[in-house]
Structures are given as C-alpha cells and as structure tokens.
Amino acid sequence: MDKLLIGGGRPLSGELRISGAKNAALPVLAATLLSDGPVTVGNVPHLHDITTTMELLGRMGLNLMVDEKLNIEVDPSTIQNFFAPYELVRTMRASILVLGPLLARFGRAEVSLPGGCAIGTRPVNLHLEGLAAMGAEINVRNGYIYAEAKRLKGCRLVLDQVTVTGTENLMMAAALADGVTIIENAAREPEVVDLANFINAMGGKVSGAGTDVLQIEGVDSLSGAGLNYRILPDRIETGTYLVATAMTGGRVKLKGTRPDLLDAVLAKLEEAGAEITLGDDWIELDMKGRRPQAVSLHTAPYPAFPTDMQAQFTAMNAIAEGVGVITETVFENRFMHVQEMQRMGADIKLESNTAIVKGVSRLTGAPVMATDLRASASLVLAGLVAEGQTKVDRIYHIDRGYECIEEKLAQLGAEIRRVPN
C-alpha cells in the first residue's frame, strides 16, 4: 500500500488541466448497458473506481476496448450474465448503478449491496422502492439484491430525500420503461444532468434535468452507434486544486473545467480573499501571497455548497485568519479528517454536525491516515502548508477520486512523492 510524502511551505503556481468527473463517468458507463450496440465514452478519468466499473462490466461479458486517448468503447450486446459480485461492489458504492439499466434492458439483475467510503448510512432503499413502484419484483437476501421485471412501467415517484445515485438509477430504469415516469425531489447535480444528456444522445427522452422534477418518456430502444460522448469536467477536483492554491498563497490557472458549476465554492474562495478570474472553460486564482481569511459554510445538495468540498475548506480554515464554522448537513460521520488535522496542530472543536475551526499560524508535519476520499485530499492540502514532512497513509482512498494527484501537485511546484509502504 502506497503513501504520500509531502514537504510543506511552497506556494503553488502554474497551469493544470482538469480531468473528467468520476461521479459523471460512473453512471454514464453503467448507462451503456441500455444501448443495443457499441457506444464510446471519452474524457474518462484514469481512476481506481473507473477500473472497477470496467471490470464489473467485463465480468458480465461486455466487450470493452480502450484506445490511445483513453476513450472507452463498450459493447453491451455480448452480455452473458446480470450479476454484480460482492468482491467488486464492496469497494465502490456506485456499483449499485448497474441495477436500473440491467432491469430495464434485460429484465433481471443480481447485485450485491454496496460498499464505498465509510461516511454515514447511504441506504439503497430509495432505489429499491422506486423500482418496485415501476413493477419490479425485488428480494434482498444474503447481502444481494435480486430483481426481476417483464417491462418496467412508467409512474410518478416522489423521493423521500434527495439522492444522487437514486435519481440516476431510476432515470436509467425509466429510459426504457413503458410510459412516462415523473421523479419528484430529484437530485439537481451537474453529474445527473450529464447522465440525462448521455441518455438523450442515445435517443432517450429525459427532460427537466437540473431541476427537482424529472420527466422521462420511455422508449423501445436506445443506440449509441456513432456516439463519442465526452464526460463533463470534475468540479470537485477543480475545487480541491483551487483551495490548495488559496492555502499556499499561490497563483494557478485551471483549464478544461466548468466555472458555471462552482458558484458556491468560488464565492467562498473570494470571501477567503482570493482574486478569481473566469473564462468559459478556465479559472485563475491568485492569492498574492496572502493568508486566507476563515469562512463559515454549511453543506447542502447542489446548487448549494457541496459536501465533497467540506474537508478541503476545513483544512483551509485550519491555517486561515479568524474562526470558521462548518456545518455538515448531507452526511453524518463526515469529520473523520478532524482528528488527523489535530495531530498536525489544528485547533478544531466538533459539536455534533458542526466543526468550529480557529485558524492557527502554522501546522506541523505528522504521520496521518486517510479515512475516506475527500478526507484524504484535505490531509494532503494540510501537508502542503505544514512545516516539515507529512506522511499520508492509506492513500488508496485518494486514488479512487483523484487522477495522479501527486503528479499534478508536483507540476504546480509542490514537494510531494508517492512511496511504497
């Protein structure tokens, strides 16, 4: 198992190209199951979760080819089984996304209950209740979901809570259902919009994506023939490098991104004292060597402040001027990075779902351990500003969501390297 060694104290500067969004690529790859022939997906990030998804599709018998530009061609016509085994699903919660398309296209699915980051209870009951309402027969036994349906029927679904993967699974299922499906209280995330765009590019009829009411008119078949669909840029990777730049007092230009998807994050960075310039597909942030000002925020579903940026802003507040109050409303148990930051000298007090962060003038390098994807990133950011060396262990979490993080940070001037344990 690898770890990262980081020497702090260098301002980040330079230019960086942003990768495709993992959280858009995973549902789009699952949605290739809906196509009646080969479909090509581009701008896919090179990440462990993507490899896992490709292995999962390959185990079902799908034919996958990757070209020199890392475009992935998926041919679902060679499918041999409808089984998603525990050993693959347990490492990645998003594996549940094959359930809806398998059921809609092939009438059956056997999918292990999911794993992924250990942040709170992220139940799949909303997925199952929605599919049952569309006419699926569902049994959960021995840790597996067994689902069957002749042809799903369109219906009106009102989700009890906002769920991104739930919205995506039900949207994919509804794409081939008989009749119209309305999903109310749907997730509005850009990645949900990207999936809707992909389904429509194959001949689907999804409208309302980006609002909280989706309407899906089921069609008889979908085809990805001649389609090369590009995944949208990763807004969380973008945000992470912007915060890293703000923390180190640097100046960085991020290219191949989507500023329009980051309003809440950019507003908080400006509040922290960053000078931000935007283009259609680039963002430049300049701290002019200043120490950031502490900011207060609370997380909520898109378009509000993203929970996936909470840990990074906790790290920024740890070395900022003033006191920042961070309230986490999306997931419970999402402050596991706090204990590790305290080992580096951060002054953070936890009260229920709130972290009160009093900025200190310096952090000191220490051995720390990653506990989940975004927590790991925040510890890397803390290491970039700490005095001395920081060792971040269990970085397989980072590899699930950040493409070559040490190479990209080194490109911006950070002292960081990956070493085997």
Swiss-Prot record:
The active site is at C117. GO terms for biological process: cell division; cell wall organization; peptidoglycan biosynthetic process; regulation of cell shape; UDP-N-acetylgalactosamine biosynthetic process. It catalyses: phosphoenolpyruvate + UDP-N-acetyl-alpha-D-glucosamine = UDP-N-acetyl-3-O-(1-carboxyvinyl)-alpha-D-glucosamine + phosphate. The keyword Transferase applies. One of its GO terms (cellular component) is cytoplasm. It is found in: Cytoplasm. InterPro entries: Enolpyruvate_Tfrase_dom, Enolpyruvate_Tfrase_sf, MurA_subfamily, RNA3'P_cycl/enolpyr_Trfase_a/b, UDP_GlcNAc_COvinyl_MurA. CDD domains: UdpNAET. The modification 2-(S-cysteinyl)pyruvic acid O-phosphothioketal is found at C117. Pathway: Cell wall biogenesis; peptidoglycan biosynthesis. Phosphoenolpyruvate binds at K22, N23. Its EC number is 2.5.1.7. Keywords: Cell cycle, Cell division, Cell shape, Cell wall biogenesis/degradation, Cytoplasm, Peptidoglycan synthesis, Pyruvate, Transferase. GO terms for molecular function: UDP-N-acetylglucosamine 1-carboxyvinyltransferase activity. Cell wall formation. Adds enolpyruvyl to UDP-N-acetylglucosamine. PANTHER family: UDP-N-ACETYLGLUCOSAMINE 1-CARBOXYVINYLTRANSFERASE. HAMAP family: MurA. Belongs to the EPSP synthase family. MurA subfamily. NCBIfam families: murA, PRK09369.1. This is UDP-N-acetylglucosamine 1-carboxyvinyltransferase.
